[in-house]
C-alpha cells in the first residue's frame, strides 16, 4: 500500500431516513411493551401476595429475635447493678408496712390462672362493648364533619409535593360490621416481649428476676367495607408552570383484617418519673386485604390500573408494618389511678368550662345566668330550712305538760 492512498470506508447499508424510522419504531415498541406488561399486566393472586408478605415479615421477626439473643449473650445485663442500687435505697417508713410487690407468680396464683392448662376465653362481652363504642363513633361522625376536616388537613399538610394539587375527600364510609375478638390467652414474656417458648416449663420466679411480664394475646377478625375516596390532580411544571394537568381519582377500601393482637403493661419507674404504659402490637401472622379502584385522565380515562393498585397496597402495608407490627409497637401512657384535684370536675369548674367553651361575650352571659340560678336555688333552700325551724320552735307562752302532771287552770 502506498503512503498517499486512503483506506476504503464501507458504505452504510441504511440511509439516515431509514435509520430514523427504525429508531422510532423501536421506541414505540418499547413503550407499548412497557404499557402492556408493566402497567396493564395481570397482578399476582391475593393468596400469593399474602403468603409472600407473611414470609418476609416472619424472616424479619426471626432476624430481630436472633439479634436480641446475641446481645443477651454478649452483655450480661449491664443495668442490673443500677437497678439493684435503686431497690436498695431507703424507702418511706409510712409505706414500708404495706403488702409486698406482686410478682408474676403471685398474680397468677391470686387470680387462679394457670398458664399451662387455662383455656382461651371467647371475649363475647368485650365484643359487645367494642361494638357499642364503634357504633357511637360512627353516629357522631355522621352528624359532625370533624373527622372529614381532620382528614383533609392531614392529607393537605405542609409536606405535600409541588406536583400534587389539593387533595379532596369525595367518599368516606366507616363500615357497618364490627371486629370480633376471640381466643384470648395470657402469655408470659420477657423484658423484650419474647415468649419463653412452647417446649420450656414456665418458671414464675425466674421470669420475675429476668424482668418478664404478662401479655394478653387475642385473635381479631374483621370483614367489612371501610372506604376512603380521594380526588386530586398531577401537575407538570416543566418547562413552565402548569404545562399539563392530569386528574386522578383513587378509592381505597379495607375489606378484611385478621391477626393476633398483643397487649401488655410496662410498670412505672419512680427513679425516671415515667408513667405506667400500655403497649400493643400485632404479630407478624396478620392478613390485611384491600380493594383499590383508580381512575386516571379527564377525557380518555384509564380505569383500575393494576400497577397503581399494587403500589398503593404495598405502601399501605409498609406503613402498617413500620408502626404496630412486631418487633415495633405502640405505647399509650396511662393516667395515675390516685384522685387528683386537677382531674376533679363539677361545681364552679363546670361553669368555668362552659365559659371557656363559648365565645367571650356569650360565655360570660351564660356563666352569669348559671351563677344566678345557683344563688337563687341556694337562697330558696336556706329559706325553706328557716321556715321549717320557725314552725317547729315553741312559743314563749306555750306549756307542754309533763307525763303524770296535773293541768293547772288560771
Swiss-Prot record:
Intervals, Cytoplasmic compartment: 41-410
Lumenal side: 1-19
Location relative to the cell: Endoplasmic reticulum membrane
Bias kind Basic and acidic residues: ranges: 387-398
TM regions (residue ranges): 20-40
Compositional bias of kind Polar residues: 71-87
Region span, Disordered: 71-98, 380-410
Superkingdom in the source lineage: Eukaryota
Annotated Gene Ontology cellular component terms: endoplasmic reticulum membrane; ERMES complex; mitochondrial outer membrane; mitochondrion
Pfam families: MMM1
GO molecular function: lipid binding; lipid transfer activity
Family, as annotated: Belongs to the MMM1 family.
Assembly, per entry: Homodimer. Component of the ER-mitochondria encounter structure (ERMES) or MDM complex, composed of MMM1, MDM10, MDM12 and MDM34. A MMM1 homodimer associates with one molecule of MDM12 on each side in a pairwise head-to-tail manner, and the SMP-LTD domains of MMM1 and MDM12 generate a continuous hydrophobic tunnel for phospholipid trafficking.
Protein name listed in UniProt: Maintenance of mitochondrial morphology protein 1
Amino acid at each position: 500500500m502506498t503512503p498517499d492512498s486512503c483506506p476504503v470506508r464501507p458504505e452504510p447499508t441504511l440511509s439516515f431516513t431509514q435509520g430514523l424510522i427504525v429508531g422510532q419504531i423501536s421506541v414505540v415498541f418499547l413503550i407499548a411493551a412497557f404499557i402492556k406488561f408493566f402497567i396493564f399486566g395481570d397482578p399476582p393472586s391475593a393468596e400469593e401476595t399474602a403468603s409472600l408478605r407473611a414470609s418476609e415479615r416472619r424472616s424479619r421477626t426471626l432476624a430481630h429475635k436472633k439479634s436480641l439473643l446475641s446481645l443477651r449473650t454478649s452483655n450480661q445485663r449491664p443495668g442490673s447493678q443500677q437497678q439493684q442500687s435503686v431497690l436498695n435505697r431507703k424507702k418511706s417508713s409510712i409505706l414500708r408496712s404495706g403488702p409486698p410487690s406482686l410478682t408474676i407468680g403471685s398474680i397468677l396464683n391470686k387470680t387462679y390462672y394457670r398458664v399451662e392448662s387455662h383455656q382461651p376465653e371467647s371475649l363475647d362481652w368485650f365484643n359487645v362493648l367494642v361494638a357499642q363504642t364503634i357504633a357511637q363513633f360512627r353516629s357522631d361522625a355522621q352528624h359532625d364533619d370533624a373527622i372529614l376536616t381532620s382528614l383533609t388537613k392531614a392529607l393537605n399538610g405542609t409536606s405535600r409535593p409541588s406536583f400534587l394539587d389539593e387533595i379532596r375527600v369525595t367518599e368516606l364510609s366507616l363500615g357497618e360490621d364490627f371486629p370480633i375478638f376471640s381466643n384470648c390467652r395470657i402469655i408470659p414474656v420477657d423484658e423484650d416481649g419474647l415468649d419463653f417458648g412452647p417446649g420450656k416449663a414456665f418458671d414464675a420466679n425466674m421470669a420475675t428476676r429476668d424482668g418478664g411480664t404478662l401479655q394478653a394475646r387475642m385473635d381479631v377478625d374483621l370483614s367489612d367495607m371501610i372506604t376512603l375516596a380521594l380526588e386530586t390532580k398531577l401537575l407538570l411544571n416543566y418547562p413552565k408552570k402548569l404545562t399539563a394537568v392530569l386528574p386522578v381519582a383513587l378509592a381505597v377500601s379495607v375489606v378484611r383484617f385478621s391477626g393476633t393482637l398483643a397487649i401488655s403493661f410496662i410498670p412505672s419507674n419512680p427513679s425516671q418519673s415515667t408513667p405506667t404504659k400500655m403497649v400493643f402490637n400485632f404479630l407478624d401472622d396478620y392478613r390485611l386485604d384491600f380493594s383499590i379502584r383508580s381512575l386516571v385522565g379527564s377525557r380518555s380515562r384509564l380505569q383500575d390500573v393494576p400497577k397503581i393498585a399494587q403500589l398503593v397496597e404495598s405502601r399501605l402495608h409498609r406503613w402498617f408494618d413500620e408502626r404496630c407490627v412486631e418487633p415495633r409497637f405502640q405505647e399509650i401512657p396511662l393516667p395515675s389511678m390516685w384522685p387528683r384535684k386537677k382531674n376533679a370536675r363539677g361545681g364552679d369548674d363546670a361553669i368555668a368550662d362552659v365559659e371557656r367553651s363559648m365565645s367571650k361575650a356569650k360565655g360570660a352571659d351564660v356563666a352569669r345566668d348559671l351563677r344566678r340560678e345557683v344563688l337563687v336555688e341556694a337562697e330558696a333552700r336556706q329559706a325553706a330550712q328557716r321556715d321549717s325551724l320557725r314552725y317547729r320552735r315553741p312559743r314563749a307562752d306555750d306549756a307542754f305538760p309533763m307525763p303524770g302532771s296535773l293541768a293547772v287552770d288560771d
